[in-house]
Amino acid sequence: MITAPIRTTARDTQIFDLISKEAHRQEEGIELIASENFTSKQVMEAMGSVLTNKYAEGLPGKRYYGGCQVVDQVEQIAIDRLKKLFGAEWANVQPHSGAQANAAIMIACLNPGDSILGFDLSHGGHLSHGSPVNMSGKYFKAHFYGVEKESGLINMDIVEATALKVKPKMIICGASAYSRDWDYARFRKIADSVGAILLADISHPAGLIAKGLLNDPIPHCHIVSTTTHKTLRGPRGGVIMMGKDFENPFGLKTPKGETRMMSNVLDMGVFPGTQGGPLEHVIAAKAVAFQEALSTDYLQYAKQIQKNAQIMAEAFLKKGYDIISGGTDNHLMLIDLRSKNLTGKEAENALIRADITINKNMVPFDDKSPFVTSGMRVGTAAITSRGMVGDDMIRIVEMIDTVLMNQTKDSVIETVRKDVNNWMAQYPLYI
């Protein structure tokens, strides 16, 4: 029972000490996980605001709770900024994550047992694109396309042949570990040829796409989903967009007998289809991040992410590492470690000891389990947020190579760790 104002409650030192430790870990190490980034202070301030106290089921102006006059404005600002950032006609900013966004889209567009065609998880795809351990693979009949063994690239002729064979109701383009750009126009032609809805999941390269540095899915894909962290540098969350709203092709009607627009179908896929109340404090943080991404400074940041990745990839190649597809167009690269007689697990664990964070990752045609893997995934979004540039990428690769070639030498790894910590002190995260 609370007998005093909440503001006088004793501080939870157990949790806040751990938060402090995590802050030190982030500040002292080199963060190379491709799906991670560092938000601005104001993004975190929005997430830690009183908006977390407000329930707001429904949409702005159409809520099931009273007292939403302020959060209505917050959410509408987030929607408007997102539409401006990507040139979209419609957007929903409520999904709690990218996977939630994809689930909502599938619930809205598909029936149990319908066929979908996505990028193979073992080739760099994502769980939410049809993996059997995910709802997308449990409730729908999933088929996959992948990359060619020699080139490491997606062969669009094979994608087309597969689509014509399996006749999917939905085709998904997007990945979590594919370093090349996507031919959205060709995917749309394929989708149209089989009557499929085309979904682009741009969770990884969204920030680069928003600034015109990669192909734009908005004019070609029926629906676009993305997370709001990664290259967008916002809070952890998801959104759904459409370049143009259109009448749903599934025959769904309103109570008045009118054909429902896809915007309405997708809105209902989010709520009440897969979620209850939206997280308005996170939506506020999304709005802040979208405003940051609309700036000219962010354009320079996005360009530097891409440049850093290309310089880093070239440095790895010069060290004799095998990069799937031979390079990168975006912010990440997938490195096959078999030529170095290493597993992804060994690489990840060795680098952690030096305060360098990457993640083990399966490579195409991998013969090892997802818990071991033959590769590692590396990304440049987070280190670019710290202000690092091209020459720094070469130094990072030197450090990584030193650690991986000296896994059993604790003294060597300790020396690298100290160098990492001293170096990162020159790039403070939050001043």
From Swiss-Prot:
The record marks 229 as: Plays an important role in substrate specificity. InterPro entries: PyrdxlP-dep_Trfase, PyrdxlP-dep_Trfase_major, PyrdxlP-dep_Trfase_small, Ser_HO-MeTrfase, Ser_HO-MeTrfase-like, Ser_HO-MeTrfase_PLP_BS, SHMT-like_dom. GO terms for cellular component: cytosol. GO terms for biological process: glycine biosynthetic process from serine; tetrahydrofolate interconversion. Keywords: Amino-acid biosynthesis, Cytoplasm, One-carbon metabolism, Pyridoxal phosphate, Transferase. Its EC number is 2.1.2.1. Its main location: cytoplasm. Homodimer. Catalyzes the reversible interconversion of serine and glycine with tetrahydrofolate (THF) serving as the one-carbon carrier. This reaction serves as the major source of one-carbon groups required for the biosynthesis of purines, thymidylate, methionine, and other important biomolecules. Also exhibits THF-independent aldolase activity toward beta-hydroxyamino acids, producing glycine and aldehydes, via a retro-aldol mechanism. This is Serine hydroxymethyltransferase. It comes from Cytophaga hutchinsonii (strain ATCC 33406 / DSM 1761 / CIP 103989 / NBRC 15051 / NCIMB 9469 / D465). The lineage of its organism: Bacteria, Pseudomonadati, Bacteroidota, Cytophagia, Cytophagales.
